[in-house]
Structure formats: structure tokens, C-alpha cells
A protein has these predicted regions:
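Basic, amphipathic "hinge/linker" alpha-helix immediately C-terminal to the N-terminal HTH DNA-binding motif
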Residues: 79-95
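N-terminal helix-turn-helix DNA-binding core of bacterial DNA-binding proteins
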Residues: 13-55
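Key DNA-contact positions within bacterial/archaeal DNA-binding proteins
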Residues: 58
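A short, conserved structural fragment
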Residues: 68-78
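Short, hydrophobic-biased segments on the C-terminal half of alpha helices
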Residues: 64-65
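Long, low-complexity, charged/polar intrinsically disordered regions in eukaryotic proteins
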Residues: 1-17
Length: 96
């Protein structure tokens, strides 16, 4: 059997893998930062997360939504963002 994958398909696959790795690394950064803010300030507010990450609040909100979808964080209205046990474990692994 011959490999019929075109060069364009191979390149697209390579780019997709790179984007996924970058996306995962960014998620790890957010989890670590949320843990740091909670340890430092007792809470992690979206405004503080956005400021520390150097992004706009909607960008931080989108990343937090992904953390929540993946079961790594929870958010409470007017109370901030909190890491789940899995999120805290991820933040600890990133720090190590």
C-alpha cells in the first residue's frame, strides 16, 4: 500500500498538531496563574487574570470557559474563578 497523503495534507496535519500543543500550553499557563492568584490574593478574578496574561478580558473569559469545559475550573458569579482538583493538579505539575 502506498502513502497517498498529499504534501498539503501533511503540512496541514503538522500545523494542526502544533496548534494543539500551543493551545494546551496556554491552558496550562492559565491554570498555573489562577492557582497563583488564589494563593496570593485569595481569589482569581477575570480582570486580574487578563491583566497578568496581558490579554483583553474577553480573551481571558474564553480561556476560562475552556478550562471549565475540560473540568479544570469553576466560576461563581461575583466570586471569581476556582480550580477543580484536576485543575490544581495540572497547575502543580506545570510548576514542577
Amino acid at each position: 500500500m502506498t502513502d497517498r497523503t498529499t504534501p498539503a495534507k501533511k503540512q496541514a496535519d503538522r500545523f494542526a498538531r502544533a496548534r494543539e500543543k500551543q493551545s494546551r500550553a496556554l491552558l496550562e499557563d492559565y491554570a498555573e496563574l489562577i492557582g497563583d492568584l488564589i494563593a496570593e490574593l485569595g481569589e482569581a478574578r477575570v480582570a486580574d487574570i487578563a491583566e497578568r496574561m496581558g490579554v483583553a478580558q474577553p480573551t481571558a473569559t474564553k480561556a476560562i470557559s475552556r478550562l471549565k469545559r475540560e473540568g479544570l475550573a469553576t466560576a461563581r458569579p461575583y466570586r471569581g474563578v476556582f480550580l477543580t482538583d484536576d485543575g490544581a493538579d495540572l497547575a502543580d505539575r506545570v510548576r514542577a
